[in-house]
């Protein structure tokens, strides 16, 4: 078999890659993870488990829900419905077809269910199986994710945003002294499950502990402890230790000495060792904890205390009479003076009391005695009364309710994460599979709460990322699915009980509509399922990586405080501290950091490099916020020597709580992978981010997402090196699916022959159909352009076509333009921007915007609507763009008001006169009346029609236009099929030729002589079909030919079948909405040139509006005659502190001057003044080691590379690791420019030099999606509000300018009485007045009369609603 690599003469595509001069110093040991894998992993891997065999599926996602809901049994346990397995059918339409036909991209879910029916013997109660039926049941269409991590719902692309919510588990807090006037801290605990009832425990101001369930009325915590089955003895013994006071005759009590309970104080009595009788300290002397520990260490175990010391202590067991065993006092009671006398009288020698730390109080004992419930039943009934007020109480109902609240897996679920968090916080060791509360949990929550009150341990930080987790798409949809299946379960049980179970099949029991409705509702209306921001590829990626704290189960805007929104130390490397919206959502909507990923428990992890004995390894470890707290972590820019050892005596490290410490190198556990891991994708695209103020960086990253894709794309000269990753992961550009060779290329498609051979050795073909002028969600233009040429060798995942806003595989949101910072006649006051006419003339910032218009022909009560060219009362001129069917031609230039699709609607008939009746009788039936309901171009829209789509209902005859579009599409399918076949045939027949040449013929077509040896010339005379007729002597060759023929036929058949399926789908008609006969969609593309009023911005938060377009000859220019493109105001810099833009401008200036220098060298080389070595030397000086791969190539390729950089040298200055000021100066010197980056500039109007040197350079600017064309409008006559009769406002209502209260004051202050009257009456809501004014204008008169404004009438009506009658009476005088 021949290797297909033999005929690769062309250069690999990788030769075309752009090389950037990189200023970064830190070697990257970890690649940026795929930027949209969060979405894909969560949905496809964890929820659907799509391409995994049934037996290998893990119990998670869809599998776990189905396992938990099934089996479903009926009330009498006769029928039992079990879940066996699930699988997905293939989708009916692909992604493109779904978005064109306004359908959802979804696959049918087929679940195999087994229905078992039992026979129960009424006497013995034994059960026997009566029958088993297994069946595959359709459970509705489940939306699938596209390869870019989005969903197509009703034809629009949507994204499900991940949600940040509080992790399940137990949390301890205090109220920060806000509740009680004294400022006393009241501690509380809250158990938050994944689903189920919340449990709160809290101290009140009197130090009694209460609990509440679901924020209902509070009860004593001991009621909860009794409800879980603890008696008074058990409660006291669990929470308190006991100590025994032994009677020492005539001396007092001997008791154990506990040094931990000693605080510094003066003794009121002597400190006496009970064992020896020695006095250690006299009364009045001071004892300290240190001294107490010393005595304890020297053997002081028991001390003597006075008789009355027992008063005020609490009994740790019942006090009994030694003689009669009668209970004198109950456990927990306080010993009083009377009780002490009884103890002395009865000569009780040992008294057990509770050990209570003097600094804290007997909280649980006090709560126990405040609680009136003395046993479990009373406690359960008390809880029942609070949760079900008004219902009759019985113990069974109370017990069942309490059990269901916290211990039933159906209704309560902590989730695995909740259990892990609970175990770690309470120091328990309960299995992770136990996802309900246990008795140990409740006992220990109370214990920890009391310890916190006593000052042991610290409260939890809610905003710590160890306490907040991410719910991604899969999990959000899983929760919806569970809701749907639980609802469905109820209907299944009802159906089981209703009918005769013996004759029922599983599909009769299941109603999939319930499930489908829930899923549909989530995708269409949920706050987290959002219309994808598709302005440019960056906005797509950012939207998919967004984390929202809002949404169901999350926070609400109004209630979120400052703490939740603030940046937390644990955000480092996980959530971007920069990128968040300005406005009310600030801090609630965040973006994931570039390198972050989400672990299986939903916590965000960040990568670190392991450090062993002060040596930095290349091992990368991902740590969550909880794990990170255990280690000392150094910065990525710590100095490392050649052997990988950390340099310096001390290293600055982060530790728990966001603090920094200096430690020795061997103590460091990890260091950051790269400084870029702190920020998000958008922020990592900003060069010199480290020199910008954070507020401006925030604006910069937000505005990059609003950049409109331009006609001509241009990657930034000054980038950060991340541009390629963003373009690749966004899905905007086209990636090669396999290694291969490019066979055909045109602007619409690329055909690549795959090099990975199948088992049969025949090649396969990839055909990439490029998107041409498609409308995005935000009406920007999606257009793909090939980057490869015929013969190029491409590798898997190479970029073979650029998409919107990409240039040579790098993201390109704007253009590089020559900028000067100087004031120019006040035209750049307040951030205005002055631009040169060249920018408009050469379409530098021109963008294409596509709008979609749709018309539906419906079946009405009076008859069907019709799409036609025959429209009543319309001139031929108005129909000039329509074809014979009444649909506009592609390529037509349209203006506002033009007809796009002609449509007529039947009109209800008015009663006819007798004369008309007579005429109808004579001349036959007149055609019924129709009215014009055509689709017109709305105001403010003009452009070129780029596409028309016609959809006809199944069974309705197609019109000429639909047939023409269909024919065009079929031709496209046929071309794809023929090209693929041609490549396969070329391969097959060249292989056959290699096999046959030199063989001896024993049978064959007429041209072949038996016994002849086959030659290449002889085979050229045969047709392809005759190749198969040849038989040769060699049996092995014949076998191989037989195999080739079989595979070739199979391949051909598969291609024909695929073609037939596509054609059939195309011709079968469409599923249109109810009542629609035909739908026509027209797409109009508009070119938007840059004009005054458009908003532009840089990447550093420097934004402004264009104020004026100046002729080139008036713009300032350089000494070599180059005219500046844009003039910006230097005052926009100092106060805003975004100095990054100046460094970018300087480096951009170096970039174009280095390019000029390279061009000069190439020119000299061509004129034979210098050799290639000088060029190589300069390139090495400029690029460093980066350029070695280019310099090893032939001379002509080096010159070709130099030509590529003739417009500007591309730099990469990574975030926080980029070029310093000195590097910029070095580049300017290398380019032969002044290191200040300033030049002499000449005024275009006067021809004189400006007084001072001016900063000039290349800067990357973006045109934002705030175009003046979409904002400006004017009103002549338009709609009025119904009640107030005032003109409406806003562009969509064709409204006017509001003349508000303050505007009235201005006219009053000016004394313009008549203007004011006109504004408040005829120009506003005086209905009669405006009609009269209109009449007088028509007659050519200039006077008007104003009446009563409608708002006055409204006010009178409001008075009347308050029963006050107001009349306006005009007296005759």
From Swiss-Prot:
GO terms for molecular function: DNA binding; DNA-directed RNA polymerase activity; ribonucleoside binding. Its EC number is 2.7.7.6. Gene3D superfamilies: 2.40.50.100, 2.40.50.150, 3.90.1100.10, DNA-directed RNA polymerase, beta subunit, external 1 domain (2.30.150.10), DNA-directed RNA polymerase, subunit 2, domain 6 (2.40.270.10), RNA polymerase alpha subunit dimerisation domain (3.90.1800.10), RNA polymerase Rpb2, domain 2 (3.90.1110.10). SUPFAM superfamilies: beta and beta-prime subunits of DNA dependent RNA-polymerase (SSF64484). Coiled coil: none annotated. It is an enzyme of class 2 (transferase). It catalyses: RNA(n) + a ribonucleoside 5'-triphosphate = RNA(n+1) + diphosphate. Keywords: DNA-directed RNA polymerase, Nucleotidyltransferase, Transcription, Transferase. The keyword Transcription applies. Pfam families: RNA_pol_Rpb2_1, RNA_pol_Rpb2_2, RNA_pol_Rpb2_3, RNA_pol_Rpb2_45, RNA_pol_Rpb2_6, RNA_pol_Rpb2_7. InterPro entries: DNA-dir_RNA_pol_bsu_ext_1_sf, DNA-dir_RNA_pol_bsu_external_1, DNA-dir_RNA_pol_su2, DNA-dir_RNAP_su2_dom, DNA-dir_RNAP_su2_hyb_sf, RNA_pol_bsu_bac, RNA_pol_bsu_CS, RNA_pol_bsu_protrusion. GO terms for biological process: DNA-templated transcription. GO terms for cellular component: DNA-directed RNA polymerase complex. DNA-dependent RNA polymerase catalyzes the transcription of DNA into RNA using the four ribonucleoside triphosphates as substrates. The RNAP catalytic core consists of 2 alpha, 1 beta, 1 beta' and 1 omega subunit. When a sigma factor is associated with the core the holoenzyme is formed, which can initiate transcription. PANTHER family: DNA-DIRECTED RNA POLYMERASE I SUBUNIT 2 (PTHR20856). Belongs to the RNA polymerase beta chain family. This is DNA-directed RNA polymerase subunit beta. It comes from Rickettsia peacockii (strain Rustic). The lineage of its organism: Bacteria, Pseudomonadati, Pseudomonadota, Alphaproteobacteria, Rickettsiales.
